[in-house]
C-alpha cells in the first residue's frame, strides 16, 4: 500500500550561476549561488505544486549547507531525514550558460558531504507513507551514498512504492564512461519509471532511435519510459501505449533543473490521480499525453528564469 509522499535521495548542492551568458568560465566575473542538485530539485518541483516530498541526503555543516536546508524547507520539503556532517563540505557546481540557455558544469565534489550518507542512516519505516522514491546517477559513484541508495530502493520496493530513476549523466564525476554506463544499467532494472533524455539515449543503449532502444530500457521492473527531447517535446512509453506532447516555444535563459522539473511535475500528477505502481502499465495514450503536456508547460515556465528551484512555478502560476 503506497502513501502520498515523494522521497528523493541523492545530492543537494549549490549551483553557481554566472553573471554573463554565452561566454567561457574565465570570462565570467561573478556567480550567484542557487540551491540545486537533481534529487533536491525534484522534491522542490513536487512540493511547489502542493505535493508532500521528503529529501534523504547529507550536507556539510557549513554556510552553503545551511543555505540549502533553509531554502528546501521554505519550499515545504520534509527535511527530517537530512543530516549534516563536518567530515566534508557541501558540493558546488559552477555553471556556464550558452546564449540559448544550455549549460556545462564544473564540479567541486571530491568527496562532498552527500557522498558520506550511509545505508545505516536509512530507516525502512520511513517508506510507510512513500508514494515514490526518486534517484539519479550522480551519487552512485563508489561511496557510502551508493549503498544508501540500495537500502532506500529496497525499502521503497518492499513498501509497494514507485521507484523512479533519472540517470542525469554527469561524465566529469566518474572515473570513466564505462563505469558510469555499467552502473546505470545495474540500477535500471530496479526502477519502475525511467526518465531519459535524447542526449543520454545513445550513450546508454548504442542507438539514437528511441523505438529501437525500448527493448533495452524495458528491463526488470521498468513499466514507464519518459523520453525528453528538449524543445522538441517529450514522449512517454508503456509496453502497450505511446504518448507525445510538443513544447510551446519560449525564450530559454537557463535550462538548469528543467529535466528535474519535468519528472517532479510528472510524478506529482501520478500521485494526484492515485496512480500506484501496479497501475503504471495501464496508463492510456490520452492520459500520457495529458501528463506530458503539463510537465512541458512546467518546464517552459522554468527555463525562462535563472536557477532551478527558484524558477519552478506553483500550481496557481500554471493556470
Describe the predicted segments one by one.
Residues 44, 92-96, 233-236:
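Short beta-strand scaffold segments in enzyme catalytic cores
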Residues 1-78:
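Glycine-rich phosphate/adenosyl-contacting loop at the front of the ribokinase-like
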Residues 125-126, 186-187, 218:
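Structural alpha-helical scaffold elements that stabilize or flank donor/cofactor-binding regions
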Residues 138-215, 232-233:
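Conserved beta-alpha-beta core of the PfkB/ribokinase-like small-molecule kinase fold
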Residues 52, 162, 193, 223-224:
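Proline-centered loop/turn at the N-terminus of a beta-strand
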Residues 52-135:
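Conserved N-terminal subdomain of the carbohydrate kinase-like
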Residues 1-7, 154, 208-319:
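Conserved phosphate-binding/catalytic region of the ribokinase-like
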Residues 129-130, 191, 222:
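Short, well-ordered alpha-helix to beta-strand connector turns
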Amino acid at each position: 500500500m503506497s502513501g502520498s509522499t515523494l522521497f528523493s535521495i541523492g545530492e543537494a548542492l549549490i549551483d553557481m550561476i554566472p553573471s554573463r551568458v554565452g561566454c567561457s568560465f574565465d570570462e565570467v566575473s561573478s556567480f550567484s549561488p542557487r540551491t540545486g542538485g537533481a534529487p533536491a530539485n525534484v522534491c522542490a518541483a513536487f512540493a511547489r505544486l502542493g505535493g508532500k516530498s521528503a529529501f534523504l541526503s547529507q550536507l556539510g555543516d557549513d554556510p552553503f549547507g545551511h543555505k540549502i536546508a533553509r531554502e528546501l524547507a521554505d519550499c515545504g520539503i520534509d527535511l527530517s531525514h537530512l543530516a549534516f556532517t563536518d567530515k566534508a563540505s557541501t558540493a558546488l557546481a559552477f555553471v556556464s550558460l550558452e546564449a540559448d540557455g544550455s549549460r556545462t558544469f564544473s564540479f567541486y565534489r571530491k568527496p562532498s558531504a552527500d557522498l558520506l550518507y550511509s545505508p545505516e542512516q536509512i530507516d525502512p519505516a520511513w517508506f510507510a507513507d512513500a508514494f515514490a522514491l526518486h534517484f539519479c546517477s550522480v551519487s552512485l559513484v563508489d561511496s557510502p551514498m551508493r549503498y544508501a541508495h540500495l537500502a532506500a530502493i529496497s525499502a521503497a520496493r518492499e513498501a509497494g512504492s514507485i521507484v523512479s530513476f533519472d540517470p542525469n549523466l554527469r561524465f566529469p564525476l566518474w572515473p570513466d564512461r564505462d563505469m558510469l554506463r555499467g552502473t546505470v544499467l545495474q540500477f535500471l532494472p530496479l526502477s519502475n519509471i525511467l526518465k531519459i533524455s535524447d542526449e543520454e539515449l545513445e550513450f546508454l543503449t548504442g542507438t539514437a532511435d528511441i523505438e529501437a532502444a525500448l527493448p533495452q530500457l524495458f528491463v526488470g521492473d521498468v513499466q514507464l519510459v519518459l523520453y525528453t527531447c528538449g524543445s522538441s517535446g517529450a514522449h512517454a512509453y508503456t509496453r502497450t501505449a505511446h504518448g507525445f506532447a510538443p513544447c510551446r516555444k519560449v525564450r530559454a535563459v537557463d535550462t538548469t533543473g528543467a529535466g528535474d522539473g519535468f519528472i517532479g511535475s510528472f510524478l506529482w500528477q501520478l500521485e494526484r490521480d492515485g496512480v500506484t505502481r501496479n497501475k503504471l502499465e495501464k496508463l492510456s495514450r490520452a492520459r500520457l499525453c495529458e501528463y506530458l503536456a503539463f510537465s512541458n508547460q512546467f518546464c517552459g515556465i522554468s527555463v525562462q528564469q535563472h536557477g532551478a528551484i527558484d524558477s519552478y512555478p506553483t500550481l496557481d502560476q500554471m493556470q
